[in-house]
């Protein structure tokens, strides 16, 4: 950080830049006099579009270059989609804050856009594109008679596949942040399809030590604290704890979704694909939580672990 300018690492994709700009504007608005600059870069996950994420490293491929920029002092913070982050960050880094969650659902876009056929109305054998094995196992549970085609790339690239597919499934949050919600045919409820852990959440990562460049880490923490959403942070901790407990990443059809059922009750639901039995396991856990308590993060983490334990019992 130089003077009052915050350097923010981001991927170069249009969605990443849009999301990072949203986060940066929120930080600047909460800290009068603070300015920022984006430090954009291309990650391994952006470059290797010819292979599935599971085949060459999973979630970390979208954040490694940004973390290197933090370590080398080229950036003060990094903005990620939480669903792109591994369940546990490396010791030298910290999940500092998260912004309020955007729509966590998955969206179906048919050929023809908003006026196209809804997912359940597609004819047998219709071809639907998605780059997520999590989505595929849940979509197959709804419509085993369809063909699911792997696709990768940015939002526009995936939407262009509609020329050869009958529909695609994308995260609602990205579509809304890119101003493309008007193209959505329908949204899947979280009961129909559980979203990826962390989906719709923007996470801000920092070094976990005092920066050797610019201001102290403590000062950056105080700047970021003004934009943290406490409820979303608790939700993020619970969902990522579930993934960590199952040692899961992009290679596994696994998901969790937490939400506050009321002001003091955090409920988390999870799924896990049992490859041996070809069965989609499901479970849920609820617990009272006081966001004002000092141990709120520990409680959120424990809720995620309890959910994972419940799933593991079904695997025995």
Tell where the protein language model's regions lie, with residue ranges:
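Small-molecule-sensing regulatory modules
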Residues: 2-48, 55, 141-316
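A conserved helix-loop-strand patch within extracytoplasmic ligand-binding domains
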Residues: 82-83, 91-145, 208
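Short, well-ordered beta-strand segments
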Residues: 7-9, 78, 96, 129, ...
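Paired acidic/hydrophobic, glycine-rich loop segments that form the ligand-binding mouth/hinge
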Residues: 71, 76-80, 166-171
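Short, structured active-site "lid" loops
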Residues: 50-77
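Short glycine-rich anion-binding loops that position phosphate/pyrophosphate groups of nucleotides
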Residues: 82-85, 173-175
